[in-house]
Amino acid sequence: MINTESSFDSSALSGAGAMGLMQITKETFWWLLSKNGEDISVEKLYDPETNIKYGTYFLSILYEEYGSWDTVYAAYNAGRSRVNSWLSDNEITKNGKLVNIPYPETAQYVNRVSRNVTEYSKLLER
């Protein structure tokens, strides 16, 4: 995920305002803070430990909601509301799984993250 999001650059800032290693937007960060009750500055997203903590927290919420890593990756990239609308469209979804992601950027993102997960898993097995 981090390789795909920021190429391991903790100071990365996207054109959309996503920050740090896992490219978390301010809005997502504030939403996550509202769920866990912490009160810390958005600038802490440039701190690798904080960024990974909240990025993985967000991934865990998405996995709890969707139960499929490909859907989690799509929601992380395109947003939950967009993915929820895709999941209700039979041309995009089959048996509750995204099979035809309409945004090429998101489809490519899901493929890149999935490939990276496979590659890093192989490295961990060594």
Sequence positions of predicted segments:
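Catalytic glycan-binding domains that act on GlcNAc-containing polysaccharides
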Residues: I2-R126
